Amino acid sequence: MKFLFDLFPIILFFATYKIYGIYSATAVAIVATFAQIGWVWLRHRKVDNMLWVSLAIIIVFGGATLILQDETFIKWKPTVLYWLFAVILFLAHSFFGKNLIRAMMKDQIKLPEPVWVRLNISWSVFFGAMGALNLYVAYNYSTDTWVNFKLFGFMGLMFVFIILQALLLGKYMEKNDNQKI
């Protein structure tokens, strides 16, 4: 359910684009992200930092799209977000000795340290590649294709990447008496 909730602004962006176009879809994405944060705040009295970052990026790039009536800015939004994720993962590990992937997942799975390092690097590279792929699609295909790719392509790639990660990690996961594998 959380997965669908996380996709809420993207799904509304997609649906609005199909009916009303890129500028209406951009406005809806901004409002939907505000609504998403409001809902999280009302339910948990705490909002994840990544949601705030996503809101800031959609306000800046979506706002520029609406004010300047130039869809280029909204097309850059996923790239900026993905590259930001990639850089944060890389810098946190390289300069601060923090493995953010381990910090997020350590309660779910137990892995040897070298595997956590590889996992962190693979996610950083994946996000970097996703950002580059977004720009490729944005600049080489129609806006219709980009919007479709933004929802279905990125979701599909993310799904495949997660499945591949799970398959690769399966051999390293430590069994625990309470955990069924």
Curated annotation (Swiss-Prot):
Q: Keyword check for Membrane, yes or no.
A: yes
> InterPro entries of this UniProt entry?
YciB (IPR006008)
The listed locations are: Cell inner membrane
Task: Kindly give the Pfam families that the UniProt entry links to this protein.
Answer: IspA
What UniProt keywords are attached to this protein's entry?
A: Cell inner membrane, Cell membrane, Membrane, Transmembrane, Transmembrane helix
Q: Hey, which family's this protein in?
A: Belongs to the YciB family.
HAMAP family attached here? YciB
Function according to Swiss-Prot or TrEMBL: Plays a role in cell envelope biogenesis, maintenance of cell envelope integrity and membrane homeostasis.
Q: In its UniProt entry, what is this protein called?
A: Inner membrane-spanning protein YciB
Organism listed in the record: Nitrosomonas eutropha (strain DSM 101675 / C91 / Nm57)
